[in-house]
């Protein structure tokens, strides 16, 4: 029972049998929790349950939570690989009570699990409790039979947990194991507590107070329990090893690394193998949860982890991408517990392969510069911060990678100077931005917004509205009026026009008044909530302070609404067909069509696209109302609404819910959530799904590494597209004199027949060419003591000439072959071949260049035994062969 997978199962099964709901791990990307870069503890997904904001259908839960600590204040990156227990990715086993059981049951459950199920010897165990927690100390004496020597009272924050300055809080009790006197270190609370002898593996948090303000705590009416056990630590304990990296899971990953680099681990390289094994887990799980490498936010942390692992692969001798080859081992070891790894295996592998290929050049350049700059430094000295910043800024070499590369030599980095250089760059960038023409145009909006305030958007409820003109601009500057023929920008106090954002294009329409007509050609948003209308005045004068009527182009808005709602249906259908790794990476919602970019590592085949389209249309046909609701952002996320990665949300968000869940065949089913699609979205949408009409996917293509683009149409545009396709298919059927259903097979047969005939024709031309043609007599002639076979061949492409030359050389045995091929469009290709016995005397490159000029070409290239050239003038074929013969005669 000591394997990692068995330990996880035993823990979860034990608490399931004790009445706990087994809850799957939440994503590593917290659901709109601005305080966290990544999920770093088991309680994160239950945070709102503990605070009472959210209700769930269970009061006891257990989970094995994926956690990452590699960014923000929870950052173990620098220590990973160099200690026995630091990781960027780890699993936290936990059991939770939301007002059900409390200390006595929590301690009883924990003690029974570790001594009965896991079989730990009680004599090796000890615990800590908070200094004032007499209740917990008494329970440990009663349940475990511990004396005071086994119950250590700690008065510091290590044994008192709180969520923040206010909210639930309470004392902790940590469980330790004595790993024996062979390891250094003393018990918790002693001066030597940082040693490895006494290992903490489970923390029980007793949430019994609510902190209303610093120093003021009130008892909670329903105390709760939050526990956390490190799976990797427990595996090391049960497997009798003192390092997490010696457990079965890490041994498998390290063996895979050793196989990939064809090198067994040694004491000097041990840290590199550990870094790679650890970082493989964190990078793979982050990608599976929708994070892709980038230069900011979570994507940048992912890139740093990737590049640190890749640098250690380079230390082990790898010169080609390796990390992607390790993914199958990880999936085999952890895929059963975390099926998202299986679903995302292709995306993970391709992302790692591409990123490692890109980083190879950066790594080579950066390490060369780092080596040169640090050559004269010795242990205890620091690399200059300016040099470290140059590596970062110019060569894309992260600071932590520089620090890691120098760590083995005992050399540090002047981080203060690095930070100062970074600050100077930011200041220079801001100054450059303010001095640019674009900036001069953009800064005008600050003054306008300060004067007029934000624009009130009315477009969710209406397409017409009256408003007052608050600002007019022409050619980047404010003006009092816009006259007939003028183009400019209008800012009003309220508007029904949607401003371009979130991938949805801006509205168009009209602004009118007495004697006034202006055409709105686009609408944008500036500074988040200032709507600016691009207009051309067609009649009258548009004046500052005037009352005007705004009217959105209804037909265009309707088409945009349909396309935007369709993107939501397609997004969810794509996730259902391709996997949960699919995340929106960009979109364009226009009246004519929609474009949708997603994270996916390979082309989406026709069968998958068909399933996506069928699922989306099945939901559309429900004609269910599209429900929009304003909610607090935390409440929205907890309700299941999908937040787009990288988007910034305020305290209140708009939640758009569509349709009822369906299976892959389009039949309605009971889903985990009440709606097929629930997203945070500020765009405009249809009121009933049936208004979309139909959804037709018209294309799929690559945008960049790991990103695919879907293009689709809806409504009338989709029907017209289908009608055009249908007419075209009918015309093809008529030309082929076949039923429509037989067109693909008939076309396939014709294409294969054409290929066969083309090959036969090419073969016939080759035979004719080598059997006798103009310019060469029946076989070959002797020039300067060398046999020369020269041919002009009609209708043979350049790609076939080399084969003819090889055949000619084979026939001659010893000699030179020169062939000019003239294509149907009159262009010429020239090939010269020299048999091996003559390459010491004659160079095919020189001979081909002698003839190329007569074909209108320049130069030519190849080897001494085979060279080629081309030109636009096939009429010079005979002259080219004659020139080659002359060059041969003169040699």
UniProtKB/Swiss-Prot annotation:
SMART domains associated with the record: tRNA_SAD (SM00863)
Domain of life: Bacteria
A Pfam cross-reference name: tRNA_SAD
Biological processes annotated in GO: alanyl-tRNA aminoacylation; negative regulation of DNA-templated transcription
Any one GO molecular function term: aminoacyl-tRNA deacylase activity
Annotated binding of Zn(2+), by residue: 564, 568, 681, 685
Subcellular location: Cytoplasm
Cofactor note: Binds 1 zinc ion per subunit.
UniProt entry keywords in alphabetical sequence: Aminoacyl-tRNA synthetase, ATP-binding, Cytoplasm, Ligase, Metal-binding, Nucleotide-binding, Protein biosynthesis, RNA-binding, tRNA-binding, Zinc
HAMAP family: Ala_tRNA_synth_B
General function of this protein: Catalyzes the attachment of alanine to tRNA(Ala) in a two-step reaction: alanine is first activated by ATP to form Ala-AMP and then transferred to the acceptor end of tRNA(Ala). Also edits incorrectly charged Ser-tRNA(Ala) and Gly-tRNA(Ala) via its editing domain.
Family: Belongs to the class-II aminoacyl-tRNA synthetase family.
Name recorded for this polypeptide: Alanine--tRNA ligase
UniProt source species: Methylorubrum populi (strain ATCC BAA-705 / NCIMB 13946 / BJ001)
Gene, per the UniProt record: alaS
């Amino acid at each position: 029972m000591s394997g990692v997978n068995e330990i996880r199962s035993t823990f979860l099964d034990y608490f399931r049998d004790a009445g706990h709901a087994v809850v799957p791990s939440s994503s590593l990307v917290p659901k709109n929790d601005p305080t966290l870069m990544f999920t770093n503890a088991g309680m994160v997904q239950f945070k709102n349950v503990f605070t009472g904001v959210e209700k769930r259908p269970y009061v006891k839960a257990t989970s094995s939570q994926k956690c990452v600590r590699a960014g923000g204040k929870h950052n173990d990156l620098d220590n990973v690989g160099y200690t026995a227990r630091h990781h960027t990715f780890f699993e936290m086993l936990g059991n939770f009570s939301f007002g059900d059981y409390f200390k006595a049951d929590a301690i009883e459950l924990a003690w029974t699990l570790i001594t009965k199920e896991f079989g730990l010897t009680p004599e090796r165990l000890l615990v800590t409790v908070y200094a004032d927690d007499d209740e917990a100390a008494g329970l440990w004496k009663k349940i475990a039979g511990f004396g005071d020597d086994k119950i250590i009272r700690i008065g510091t924050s290590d044994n008192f947990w709180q969520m923040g300055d206010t909210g639930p809080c309470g004392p902790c009790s940590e469980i330790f194991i004595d790993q024996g006197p062979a390891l250094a270190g003393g018990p918790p609370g002693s001066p030597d507590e940082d040693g490895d002898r006494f290992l903490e593996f489970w923390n029980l948090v007793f949430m019994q107070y609510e902190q209303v303000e610093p120093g003021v705590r009130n008892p909670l009416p329903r105390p709760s329990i939050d526990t956390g056990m490190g799976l990797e630590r427990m595996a090391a304990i049960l497997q009798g090893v003192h390092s997490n990296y010696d457990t079965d899971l890490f041994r498998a990953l390290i063996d895979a690394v050793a196989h990939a680099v064809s090198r067994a681990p040694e004491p000097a390289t041990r840290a590199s193998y550990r870094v790679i094994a650890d970082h493989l887990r964190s990078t793979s799980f982050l990608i599976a949860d929708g994070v892709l490498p980038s230069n900011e936010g979570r994507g940048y942390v992912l890139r740093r982890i990737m590049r640190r692992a890749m640098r250690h692969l380079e230390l082990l001798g790898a010169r080609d991408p390796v990390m992607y080859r390790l993914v199958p081992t990880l999936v085999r070891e952890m895929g059963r517990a975390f099926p998202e790894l299986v679903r995302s295996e292709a995306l993970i592998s391709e992302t790692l392969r591409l990123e490692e290929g890109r980083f190879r050049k950066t790594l080579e350049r950066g390490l060369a510069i780092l080596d040169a700059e640090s050559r004269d430094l010795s242990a205890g000295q620091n690399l200059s911060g300016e040099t470290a910043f140059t590596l970062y800024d110019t060569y894309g070499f992260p600071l932590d990678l520089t620090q890691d590369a120098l760590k083995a030599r005992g050399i540090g980095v002047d981080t203060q100077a690095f930070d100062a250089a970074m600050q100077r760059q930011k200041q220079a960038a801001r100054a450059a931005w303010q001095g640019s023409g674009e900036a001069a145009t953009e800064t005008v909006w600050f003054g306008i917004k300060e004067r007029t305030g934000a624009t009130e958007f009315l477009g969710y409820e209406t397409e017409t509205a009256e408003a007052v003109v608050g600002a007019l601009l022409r050619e980047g500057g404010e003006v009092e009026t816009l006259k007939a023929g003028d183009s400019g920008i209008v800012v009003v106090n309220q508007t029904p026009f949607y401003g371009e954002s979130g991938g949805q294009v801006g509205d168009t329409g009209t602004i009118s008044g007495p004697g006034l007509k202006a055409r709105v050609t686009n609408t944008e948003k500036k500074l988040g909530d200032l709507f600016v209308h691009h207009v051309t005045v067609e009649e009258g004068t548009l004046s500052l302070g005037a009352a005007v009527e705004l009217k959105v182009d209804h037909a265009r808005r309707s088409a945009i609404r349909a396309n935007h709602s369709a993107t939501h249906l397609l997004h969810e259908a794509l996730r259902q067909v391709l996997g949960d790794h699919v995340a929106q990476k960009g979109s364009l919602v226009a009246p004519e069509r929609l474009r949708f970019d997603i994270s996916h590592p390979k082309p989406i085949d026709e069968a998958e696209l068909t399933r996506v389209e069928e699922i989306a249309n099945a939901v559309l046909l429900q004609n269910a109302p599209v429900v929009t609701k304003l909610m607090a952002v935390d409440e929205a996320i907890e309700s299941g609404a999908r937040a787009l990665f990288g988007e910034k949300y305020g305290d209140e968000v708009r939640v758009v819910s569509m349709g009822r869940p369906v299976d892959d065949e389009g039949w309605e089913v009971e889903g985990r959530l009440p709606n097929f699609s629930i997203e945070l979205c500020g765009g405009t949408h249809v009121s009933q799904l049936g208004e979309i009409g139909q959804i037709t996917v018209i294309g799929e293509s690559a945008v960049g590494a790991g990103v695919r683009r879907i293009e689709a149409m809806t409504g009338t545009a989709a029907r017209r597209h289908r009608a055009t396709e249908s007419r075209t298919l009918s015309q093809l059927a008529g030309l082929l004199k076949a039923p429509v259903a037989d067109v693909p097979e008939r076309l396939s047969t014709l294409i294969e027949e054409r290929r066969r005939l083309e090959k036969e024709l090419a073969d016939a031309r080759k035979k004719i060419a080598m059997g006798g043609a103009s310019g060469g007599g029946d076989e070959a002639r002797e020039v300067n003591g060398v046999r020369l076979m020269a041919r002009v061949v009609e209708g043979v492409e350049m790609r076939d000439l080399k084969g003819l030359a090889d055949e000619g050389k084979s026939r001659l045995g010893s000699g030179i072959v020169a062939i000019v091929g003239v294509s149907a469009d009159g262009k010429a290709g020239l090939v010269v071949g020299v048999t091996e016995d003559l390459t010491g005397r004659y160079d095919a490159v020189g001979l081909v260049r002698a003839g190329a000029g007569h074909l209108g070409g320049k130069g030519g290239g190849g080897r001494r035994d085979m060279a080629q050239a081309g030109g636009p003038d096939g009429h010079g074929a005979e002259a080219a062969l004659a020139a080659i013969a002359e060059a041969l005669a003169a040699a």
